[in-house]
């Protein structure tokens, strides 16, 4: 940050973009958002186990509601989207954002995406950025193989990271979320990125971009529902979507 306040000009903030350069494009191996509280746990997951959503490329893809891979940092092997072949083929990321290094702005723009380009996985494949983060669909044997293989459709499963611990992403997220919640005294949300060296998977860097408390009151409920008497309950269920209060 360059502070110009002494001259009455305000502050100018500079934020480095995380990523690798691929010809005229620049993007990280992984962008992600994680929360220390998961309101939609699946199977043996618990709310306090947290939740993460990750994708290839710049984080704008996640912010814009793009298809991501969802997992709990404490249960990285339980990936619902990879539970069946049809589900994996349907619920996988097919596009991503990259910084267009050829698009040099001559003036400042209020459009934060003016120098971004939206690409397909074939572009990333040609640039060699999928090697450690995909599975490959074999149409002849009708199976999905862990890892990158020539030919076949590529599925962004991040299998080598979540299943085979090429990079300890799940454990790193779990520790950061736990410490962040402990220090802030409430559930937290983080934004992060991971860069992997395309030529050496043992060289990877984790970047913690932002951490902030979750302040949405609709998602924070201190009520002890076990104290509510059955005769005072209008409707109850053991399977619900998140927490909320309705005042009548």
Regions found by a protein language model. Give the residues of each.
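Conserved catalytic micro-motifs used in adenylation/nucleotidyl-transfer and phosphoryl/amide-
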Residues: 23-46, 52-53
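Conserved metal-phosphate-binding beta-hairpin within the catalytic cores
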Residues: 186-213
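Conserved catalytic alpha/beta cores of large enzymes that bind or transform nucleotide phosphates
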Residues: 48-173, 177-183, 187, 194-195, ...
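Short, flexible loop/turn elements at secondary-structure junctions
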Residues: 16-21, 56-60, 162, 194-198, ...
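Metal-dependent catalytic core segments for phosphate chemistry
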Residues: 206-208, 212-244
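Single conserved hydrophobic/aromatic residue that forms the stacking wall/gate
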Residues: 2-13, 246-247
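Short acidic, glycine/serine/threonine-rich loops at helix termini
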Residues: 23-28, 64-68, 199-207, 220-223
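Short intrinsically disordered coil segments
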Residues: 28-33, 69-73, 223-229
